[in-house]
Design a protein with these regions (language model features):
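Short hydrophobic/aromatic beta-strand micro-patches
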Residues: 48-50
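Conserved histidines in hydrophobic membrane contexts and catalytic metal-binding motifs
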Residues: 30
Length: 98
């Protein structure tokens, strides 16, 4: 059974989905400590994203900055296609849709 996501993410789901949509993303998921709800006050936020088409570095960078402003935390963004093969299964298994 998957754990519930951190309250910080739960309280901003609508805004995060809106941001994702505005940058052409078809999917945004949280993984890592925020998905396991074992994050500390210093934890960053890890997002796994997929686009409905090719994703530009500009779009991903702008999303990263907007998400950091919204959440008040450091944010990391990775695409499904960029996941390292050794991490892929774990990340896909623990990631939670927003």
């Amino acid at each position: 059974m998957k754990a519930s996501m951190h309250p910080l993410i739960e309280s901003h789901c609508t805004q995060l989905r809106s941001l994702a949509s505005s940058y052409g993303l078809s999917s945004i998921r949280v993984f890592g400590s925020m998905a396991r709800d074992d994050a500390s006050n210093l934890s960053d936020v890890d997002f796994l994203v997929e686009g409905s088409g090719p994703l530009s570095g500009f779009s991903l960078g702008a999303l990263l900055m907007d998400a950091q402003d919204l959440l008040g935390r450091k944010v990391d963004i990775v695409t499904v296609n960029s996941l390292h093969p050794l991490m892929r299964d774990r990340v896909l298994h623990e990631s939670l849709p927003i």
